[in-house]
Amino acid sequence: MAGRRAMRPSGSSMRGVVARLAAARSPAVSFLVAAAAGAALVGGVYFWLVVSSFRLPDSRAVGCLPDGEGSWAIGMYYGKSPLELRPIELEGRSNGNSSAWPVANPVLTCATPTEGGYPSNFVADPFLYVQGDTLFLFFETKTVSTMQGDIGVARSLDQGATWEFLGIALDEAWHLSYPFVFKYENEIYMMPEGNKKKELRLYRATKFPLEWTLEKVLIDKPLIDSSLVQYDGLWWLFASDFTRHGIEKNAELEIRYSNSPLGPWSEHKQNPIYRSDKSLGARNGGRLFIFEGSLYRPGQDCSGTYGRKVKLYKIEKLTKEEYKEVPVNLGIEEAKKGRNAWNGMRYHHIDAQQLASGGWVAVMDGDRVPSGDSTRRSLFGYMGFLVAVALVTFVGFVKGAISCYIPPSFWVPLTRRSELSRILPVHRFNLKIRRYSTSIGRNISATKARLSEKTWSNTLFFCVIALIGIVNVCIAVHFLLGGNGAEEAYTHQGQHSQFTMVTMTYEARLWNLKLFVEHYSRCESVREIVVVWNKGNHPTSDAFDSTVPVRIRVEEINSLNNRFRGDPLIKTRAVLELDDDIMMTCSDVEKGFKVWREHPERMVGFYPRMIDGDPLQYRNERYARGKKGYNLILTGAAFMDSEFAFSKYWSQEAKEGRDYVHKNFNCEDLLMNFLYANASSSRTVEYVHPAWAIDTSKLSSVAISRDTQKHYDIRTKCLAKFASIYGPLPQKWLFGMREDGWDK
């Protein structure tokens, strides 16, 4: 009996269980669970449609982490003049080892020192040192372990097309940046910014480029972004001192002069040259240079955000007593792709130098986000979350699902008689609060009564509240989970590249084409869009809202073979053949480009098919999924090597197939797959799974695939024809073979 009594639950524990069960079935819990489920559904759909296309931070990464100062990177520029510089991708410099045809900016990113064993969040403030045919690049790298700047150095043996990270040249206990490197009397010096030390230091190379020793302290002031130049018999030092009284940060400039870069230094009579208005470019933006006898100074326009852009000034007068400069055109075209460009939001530093050949080379840093972006995104995200929670709570109160009761005794303190005199003021205050809360409670009750009535106005009110809640859930997901909001390009072996997009269309699809061009021109790696115009009156290039050049190639004959016609004006090896009725994210396009660069001998696309059977039969992607593999990629959305693919398609051996395609106005993509398979014994196709893709061909009256069954019957006949001419297609390749999961 005693044992049985011990096992029987006590009355208090039973009451606790009953209370918990009642709470679980309470209207408040049910309402909150339903609201959370609805918010999760809305957030999940928004994440899938929008946020999943962004390049999200890798939780396992040791470098390139979100940073409030930005995500700075460094690009290369060339020209016959420092006033007419073009980015490296327009110069046709290539690197076959990384499938970069051409190499594209940025050439150095946070990944450069990170992969070299020095995890970094960004690289900025680049300075060149030219030594014969070798370029050395000194730059600030924000080290992850200390969260401060160190000076890194890289070397290029091919005029800047490829860079080798050599290591950290200078590391102090304080933040370092702006590594101004120069040569004087056969010694190489570095004058970095280290304003936290409150002095301007000069270092000398003991074993260039990695070993340096302190030569001397030039000036006992925390000078910012100091630049030297020898001009008209004197050495001039341009810098900013933000500790000077009455000046605006990033808006001050002062000048000093000396007979030697080692000092001593005297102040210019007009100091400070600038003291207000951050848009004037007072803060230095790189090395001063002399061109055709004139002296030029780059400065930073810091209006709106720090380092918004570089402004160039031509110095018309520089003496010990006078100074005058006027703005001139920098000569570098600004990025138009916003966050999808590596320098789309800001660029604040340039170093241009003349080579022995007479040409000019320059390095410039850039960022795709404004200063403080990661902090702002977190703030907006949490605000959206809190507003959504507040709206849910409000609706719960109004609908009666959530209630809040404060007993009257809460406002009456329990005290001993001896403490009454001390407690009376608190008691009076509590009574006031109680009266106010009672009044608020009556108003809430009245509001609940009004809103509980079933009227059109109340229904509209709650619909508006629901819409605001949905918007705020999307805001929270966008800013908290969306990274920096950019659809960034991927590197292969540390380098970026570009591709040309080719689409074939007709007059009847012009409306579709305009949407197509506007969307895809914003993708970071797109160099040019070529429109193969097969039929009808063609538009002009300026009819499109595009951030890249659009070229209309008018064909004489309306034939699907025109899709793969050789085009000597295409400047990239990689071509993305994409139908104008397919829309997908730029991020998925960039993934496909990266996969193609890993295997440029393959066709890499987004629409797989499995062709088998006896006789061969054409089926949809669902069949390939059932077979768990594929052996054909549709060229309506596929990357290929234009030099190989186009020449192969227009070779003599492909003539019979081309004639069949022209006759049936179909199957050009199948023919290309057979030609690839016939040319190699190794793998020729690879699939990339897009997050989502919209195919509007079924909505078009001119699409050849709008009648699905007829379309499939024609393509089945094509398979039999091409197999008899060119042999079988390759074996099946399984889905999900890539480690990154992009082919699932």
From Swiss-Prot:
GO terms for molecular function: glycosyltransferase activity; metal ion binding. InterPro entries: Exostosin, GINT1_N, Glyco_hydro_beta-prop_sf, GT64_dom, Nucleotide-diphossugar_trans. Mn(2+) binds at D581. It is an enzyme of class 2 (transferase). Its cofactor is Mn(2+). It is a multi-pass membrane protein. Its EC number is 2.4.99.-. Essential protein. Glycosyltransferase that mediates the glycosylation of glycosylinositol phosphorylceramides (GIPCs), the major sphingolipids in the plasma membrane; acts as a HexN(Ac)-specific GIPC sugar transferase. Responsible for the glycosylation of a subgroup of GIPCs found in seeds and pollen that contain GlcNAc and GlcN (GlcN(Ac)). Maybe involved in the maintenance of cell-cell adhesion. This is Glucosamine inositolphosphorylceramide transferase 1. It comes from Oryza sativa subsp. indica (Rice).
